[in-house]
Amino acid sequence: HTLAQETLSLSFEVFPPKQDSAFDSVKKATEEIAKLRPAFVSVTYGAGGGTSQYTLDIAKNIKDSYGVSTLAHLTCVSSTKETVHRKIEEIKAAGIENIMALRGDIPPDMDLSHQEKWTYRHAIDLIRELKESGADFCIGGACYPEKHPESHNQKEDIHFLKEKVDAGCEFLTTQMFFDNNLLYNFLYKIREAGITVPVVAGIM
């Protein structure tokens, strides 16, 4: 397990293209990234799953062509159970073992009046689905050194984060931050709360 090793590791995040014409340029960029031998390459997922097939194609190409571990993002907001199950099967078929399980950004035109009826309201719902699938995925989740914008306070945010880890998250990646002290304080608080999984700092 790469993140369990006590050595400095570097990873990259790749954004899938929105158009077919840009796919070759992304492949070229990933070829250059692979030469740096990163610990892994993370491949994001389009809002609402719009570029989800590109996510898998790019992740599989990096893994198969360069032998670099890949982390495929998977979001669940506005998704049906059938859609998520299909995506899980596609990820398994592609040989991808690492998944970043996210709720995803809520589309601006989405009806928010009946959220209680959504199949996947939070990332934890997707994490549970992945665990119940029977596949041996390594599941990652997001965390927020400055607290999630929808949380009332950081204590509540860390409580929900602990639930995510208990549900099956094996590592966490932070949202981008610009003050190292925010990260240090956050790490102290989550360790106090019993969250012991590796934390990847998201920087740009």
Show which residues each predicted segment covers:
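Glycine-rich anion/phosphate-binding loops
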Residues: C76-A93, K117-R121
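Hydrophobic faces of well-ordered beta-strands that scaffold small-molecule active sites
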Residues: L8-P16, V41-V43, T70-L74, I99-A101, ...
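Alpha-helix-loop-beta-strand connector modules within alpha/beta enzyme cores
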Residues: G49-H73, W118-G141, Y184-I203
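Conserved N-terminal beta1-alpha1 strand-loop-helix module at the mouth
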Residues: H1-V43
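Active-site mouth loops of central-metabolism enzymes
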Residues: S9-S25, T70-E82, G140-E156
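Short, acidic/polar
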Residues: D20-I33, T55, K81-I88, N153-E163
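Glycine-rich, proline-tolerant flexible connector loops at the mouths of alpha/beta enzymes
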Residues: P17, P38-I58, I106-W118, E170-F186
